Swiss-Prot record:
Residue ranges of the region described as Disordered: 1-96, 382-457
Pfam families: ABC2_membrane (PF01061), ABC2_membrane_7 (PF19055), ABC_tran (PF00005), PDR_CDR (PF06422)
Coiled coil feature spans: 67-102
Source organism of this protein record: Dictyostelium discoideum (Social amoeba)
Mode of membrane association: Multi-pass membrane protein
Stated name of the protein: ABC transporter G family member 1
Lineage summary: Eukaryota, Amoebozoa, Evosea, Eumycetozoa, Dictyostelia
Domain ABC transmembrane type-2 as annotated: residue spans: 527-785
Length: 793
């Protein structure tokens, strides 16, 4: 482990340098590509690429369904073919350089154009002060067509419906409403779509104890068809590592984002997540906030990697909240959502023109993404309006109100939204700079000369203005064009395709791979096992010291029952709580993998249960061995080895039962906080009716049923039977009552506590049923959570 830590530290040291050097390389590549595109506007030809890994064999398809395609363009392309060929000859060197940097970019065959039409989605909500739920529409008539080889960005303020739309497009959310999706003009089928697309979640849910290469090898063997040889799968992994620039960290632990387990950087984690989806060669890749939580340079590097994937012929669809301008420039098409409606759809570089035409202007130095989100974020409209007076008063005090009577325009100009020339503002950003004022006036004059209409004063769109903008889009040029394109796709431009059904790994392969991952995880974290082992030894020694070498006197009766209760609680409570804190992270990874169809629920559940069972057997055995001999559990003449093994068996069953309960609780509750609050209450409640604190004969009538469902009752009853059956106790003359010892036989102790002396093996099988029952319920909960079928209308 020390050597592993040293390697991790070394990788940590150069990961930043690696990220920076690769970042500079990406910038240089983008400059070369921009130079090439300016000199040669026609797209490069893509040769056929037989991707055996994804098991999909598409027929020849026409990916060039474009919003701007028409017969005139086709004729112009034919007339200019010779000129383009000359340009191609002049730029051969540039093309060769680009191909060397990305061999796969012009060899992707399975290109898919993705379209969606009239997506309407409703959710059930409860209004304040009312119990009845009402239906609220959160997506309204959303349309779009995404060409292969492009990046399609979905933007909008929080609550606009971005993630909901992406989940619907990815078939991860049932449509509660209507809508149709098309793949190359064919109505989307869930099974086909699952084979053609990859989905990258916002969070990087990865096993921290595996290296990057081990992670990709694991998913390659599970995601790729079973008939693909292992050698080809491993080669595919190496190709992806090369393509995504992960060579330097390939043998470094993934680690955790909070550095509890040190590993790769955030940008590398994001690229690993994307790489997992690339293993099967998907034609469509959907990403939820791919730059979330990353710094500026890392975000640019990740988006540059996605741009390369798009240039190779893949269709990239992503939601993104507020990208920097250099990232926004990478988008080919943009869907801007506001309150679940389409505010703009079309070319990303044409969005500003659209808003300019509607009277909303963005200054040249402002990031378009900031402008769009500031403009349509009506959720903070009321707060913004209420602060206007205070804002203007403050600016007059600081800026002196110089330059005009308007007063409040400086703050608006600072966020990049130009206002009416009649509303001259004060100093920009509270700085009295004459040069900036002159530039502002020149900009306003230029805008006035190019647009005769008076500019609206905008900080945020009012609700009325938002309604107007929503109504304007469907009748706009962009809205009419996309509707016409979708009609043509759904009626005329169908491109039939076939795919070969392939089989993934069988049950045994899935189980062995998942179990191997669990074993590796345990080996990479020996400290966790060591801590649990020390805890087990400490509990045994503590109990053994306190109850050391108990005799058979009258006072030992109480002490022997105390040993039983103490040690059962000692192994049970930690088993529950440790699972509550660990299992949620495992469930997160499972749900992500299950949604992608990586493996089935049963092999995952069995592999996890088997590994937990092994640990839950060893530790109680250690505790039981120490306690049994130190406390002198059996000293009667009928002593044999059988009571010792029965004692060990009871502690193992107690640990397994509570471990299974902890797994059930942690899989059922929404988070760790709820689990840590619920688990102790359940344990205490069931332990209260175990027969140790209250005699089972004294339980109130209306609660008489509760001891029968308390698993602690069966644990303690079996342990008491094992400790007291056929044991003879002694007493001194002073302790005798009427010449007789108060307690002579252990069998009497068992009966006085309300237990049955013949129920030991019955209780053993009841506890086995509890373990199975808790595990089956856990399996059903996981199965229910992982079910996510798409309802096609």
């Amino acid at each position: 482990m020390d050597s592993n830590n040293n390697n991790n530290n070394e990788n940590e040291a150069f990961s930043g340098a690696s990220e920076s050097s690769e970042f500079r390389k990406i910038v240089e590549e983008n400059e070369n590509e921009r130079e090439f595109e300016q000199s040669n506007p026609s797209p490069p030809e893509y040769s056929n690429y037989e991707n055996k890994d994804d098991g999909i064999n598409l027929e020849t398809i026409n990916p060039n369904i474009s919003l701007d395609n028409n017969n005139n363009n086709n004729q112009n392309n034919q007339n200019n073919q010779n000129n383009n060929n000359n340009n191609n000859n002049q730029n051969n060197n540039i093309i060769n350089n680009l191909n060397k940097k990305n061999k796969k970019r012009s060899t992707f065959k399975n290109r898919i154009d993705f379209s969606f039409k009239d997506i309407n989605h409703y959710v059930q909500i409860t209004e304040k002060g009312k119990k009845k739920k009402i239906s609220k529409q959160i997506l309204t008539n959303i349309n779009g067509h995404i060409e292969s080889g492009t990046i399609f960005a979905i933007m909008g303020p929080s609550g606009a419906g971005k993630t909901t739309l992406l989940d619907i497009l990815a078939h991860r959310l049932n449509i509660n409403g209507s809508g149709t999706m098309y793949l190359n003009g064919n109505k989307s089928d869930f099974n086909i779509f699952k084979k053609l697309c990859g989905y990258v979640t916002q969070s990087d849910s990865l096993m921290p104890s595996l290296t990057v290469r081990e992670t990709l090898n694991f998913y390659a063997q599970l995601k790729m068809p079973r008939d693909v040889p292992l050698k080809e799968k491993l080669q595919r992994v190496q190709d992806i590592i090369d393509e995504m620039g992960l060579n330097r960290c390939a043998d470094t632990l993934v680690g955790t984002a909070d550095n509890k387990i040190r590993g790769i950087s955030g940008g590398e984690r994001r690229r690993v997540t994307i790489s997992i989806e690339l293993l099967t060669g998907p034609s469509v890749i959907l990403l939820d906030e791919p730059t979330s939580g990353l710094d500026a340079s890392t975000s640019f590097y990740v988006m540059s990697a996605l741009k390369k994937l798009a240039k190779s012929g893949r269709t990239i669809i992503c939601t993104i909240h507020q990208p920097r301008s250099n990232i926004y420039d990478m988008f080919d098409n943009l869907l801007l959502l506001g309150d679940g409606n389409t505010i703009y759809y079309g070319k990303a570089n044409k969005a500003l023109e659209y808003f300019n035409a509607n009277g909303y202007h963005c200054s040249e130095k402002t990031n378009p993404a900031d402008f769009f989100l500031d403009l349509i974020n009506t959720q903070v409209e009321d707060q913004a309006d209420s602060d206007d007076d205070d804002y203007n008063d403050e600016e007059e005090e600081i800026g002196g109100g110089g330059g005009g009577s308007g007063g409040g325009a400086g703050g608006i100009e600072d966020i990049g939204i130009s206002i009416s020339p009649t509303m001259n503002g004060s100093a920009v950003d509270n700085i009295k700079n004459n040069e900036l004022k002159q530039q502002q006036q020149q900009q306003q004059q230029q805008q006035q000369s190019t647009d005769g209409r008076a500019r609206r004063r905008i900080k945020k769109l009012t609700k009325e203005e938002m309604v107007i903008l929503k109504k304007e889009y469907p009748n706009s040029e962009q809205g009419l064009r996309v509707n016409e394109t979708l009609d043509n796709i759904s009626k005329e431009n169908r491109t039939d395709f076939k795919y070969e059904k392939t089989r993934g790994p069988n049950f045994l392969t899935q189980f062995s791979l998942l179990l191997g991952r669990e074993v590796t995880n345990a080996k990479r974290h020996p400290m966790a096992f060591k801590v649990n082992l020390i805890q087990a030894i400490f509990q045994g020694l503590l109990c053994g010291i306190v109850y050391y070498q108990l005799g058979l006197g009258q006072s030992s009766v109480q002490s022997r029952t105390g040993v039983v209760a103490f040690i059962i609680m000692g192994v049970s409570f930690p088993a529950v709580m440790s699972t509550i804190h660990v299992f949620p992270d495992v469930i997160t990874i499972f749900l992500k993998d299950r949604a992608s169809g990586v493996y089935d629920t049963l092999p995952f559940f069995l592999a996890k249960s088997f590994m937990d069972a092994c640990i839950a057997v060893l530790l109680p055995m250690v505790t039981a061995t120490i306690v049994y001999w130190m406390t002198n559990q059996r000293v009667d003449p009928f002593y044999s080895a059988a009571p010792f093994f029965r004692f060990v068996l009871m502690l193992v069953l107690a640990s397994q039962t509570c471990l299974s309960l902890g797994v059930l609780i942690s899989s059922s509750v929404p988070n760790v906080q709820v689990g840590t609050a619920v688990a102790p209450l359940i344990v205490i409640l069931f332990f209260l009716f175990s027969g140790f604190f209250i005699n089972l004969n004294d339980v109130p009538g209306w609660l008489v049923w509760f001891p029968y469902i308390s698993f602690f009752r069966y644990m303690i009853e079996a342990a008491v039977i094992n400790a007291f059956k056929d044991v003879h106790f002694t007493c001194t003359d002073s302790q005798k009552i009427g010449g007789v010892c108060p307690v002579q036989y252990g069998n009497n102790v068992i009966e006085n506590m309300g237990y049955d002396i013949d129920h030991f093996w019955r209780n053993v099988w009841i506890l086995v049923l509890y373990i199975i029952g808790f595990r089956v319920l856990t399996f059903l909960v996981l199965k229910l959570k992982s079910r996510n079928k798409f309802k096609q209308e």
